[in-house]
Regions:
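N-terminal redox-cofactor-binding region of secreted/periplasmic oxidoreductases
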Residues: 1-101
Length: 101
């Protein structure tokens, strides 16, 4: 993708540069007449913690990469509140999967 010219007008604004957001932006960008803005709250996924599967445990719970959601306590599981990882990086949760397919 190219860096767009300075503009305050957008045809499409996509919130979240996860897998779906990036694919959508790419497809829309095939029409050179459209101004598209892709917004991501997190960082680029260039960290070795993301690139090396053995370091993947260092990503979960790390506020730089993970939104650190916590589920409501579950009565069927002794009211335990489980952590629910969600990617806060370019690539979204796909960047946190430890390259497991």
């Amino acid at each position: 993708m190219q860096t767009p010219k300075q503009t305050n007008e957008w045809d499409y604004i996509i919130i979240g540069a996860g897998t779906a957001g990036c694919v959508l932006a790419n497809r829309l960008a095939s029409n050179k007449k459209l101004n598209i803005l892709l917004i991501e709250a997190g960082y680029q996924d260039k960290s070795l913690k993301i690139k090396i599967p053995a370091l993947q445990p260092l990503v979960f719970g790390n506020k730089k990469f993970d939104w650190c959601y916590k589920a409501n306590p579950d009565a069927t599981r002794d009211n335990i509140s489980h952590i629910w990882p969600a990617g806060k990086v370019w690539g979204g949760s796909s960047s946190l999967n430890g390259m497991i397919y």
